[in-house]
Amino acid sequence: MFQFKWKRLGIVAGLSLSLVVAGCGQEDTDDTANNADNGGDDQTETTANVSSEIEYTITGIEPGAGITQATDNALTEYENLSGWEQETSSTAAMLTALGDAIDNEEPIVVTGWSPHYMFAKYDLKYLEDPEGVFGGVEYIATIVRKGLKEDMPEAYTILDRFQWEPADMESVMLAAQDIDFEKAAQQWVDENQETVAEWTDGVEPVDGTPIELVLTPWDTERSSANVAKVVLEQQGYDVTLTPVDPSVMFQAIAEGDGDASLAPWMPQTHAAFYEEYEGQFEDLGKNLTGAKIGLVVPSYMDIDSIEDLEPAE
């Protein structure tokens, strides 16, 4: 087994997030729409107040995340974000700050992505991104180390066929609110035998062959990795899941320290890491489409675009 070389790579992301279900951004409320119609000086004053109230700060997540890099790019690309800063910490800290702001109906701008339970729990919206810094709709890809097809043809076939919908991932995350991810994944597999049968059709069982799946510490990826784990284990594999920073994920697969990953967000979020190691791994294509990243605000905030934010004084 290509067991991950922890000490040599030296970065471990052992976060335990509570992402349970995803959704898309909500439409503006009637009050928000009416306020926006006023336009003029009132709108300018409102956005200026919002920007100063949050001290020209975007509440971000982990420094190594792709969305963190994209937000840094936005701070450069948008002239009106001159003087703004991104405050990085952790996904859990961002979610706490978002919840506190909403409880007090205060302004906040966070880095967000979907699928994510925050859109189901709160009334949120993505800010429009006229410059396209955050890209459009994303997909999640499957990558494997070179030689996996020859070494583990059965696992390769299953991973190559693995494809599901955002609603499938959402159902696992929702179940994982009350039970652990492996049990939630087993529940999904039990309820979706036709889909699993398509992945495993004609695949011969193995006898305890070890395989390591590398993932990022988002619960979206914990969902896909655990479902793949259950399916591979049913075929006789001994599966290890290794959560790491995104850059390490690509390095692990490129260098053969991990066997496969169902976690890369493309074409924007993990583009830099993908390009750094391109050609050193095999890309099996999309396993989920319809993902998105961007700047997110509560719907009660009277702004709709990144360009509505005011430069720092």
Q: What are the roles of these predicted feature ranges?
A:
Residues L19-G23:
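C-terminal motif of bacterial Sec signal peptides marking the signal peptidase cleavage site
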Residues G25-D28:
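Bacterial signal peptide processing site
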Residues T44-T59, R145, Q163-P166, F281-E282, ...:
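A conserved helix-loop-strand patch within extracytoplasmic ligand-binding domains
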Residues E45-A48, S52-G60, L159, D207-T220, ...:
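Short, well-ordered beta-strand elements
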Residues E85-A97, W218-D219, T240-A252:
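Short helix-initiation/N-cap motifs at beta->coil->alpha
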Residues E105, M118-E131, A271-L284:
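Ligand-binding "clamshell"
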Residues F119-D160, K286-G294:
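Periplasmic-binding protein-like
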Residues S223-S305:
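Short, glycine-/small- and polar/acidic-enriched structural segments
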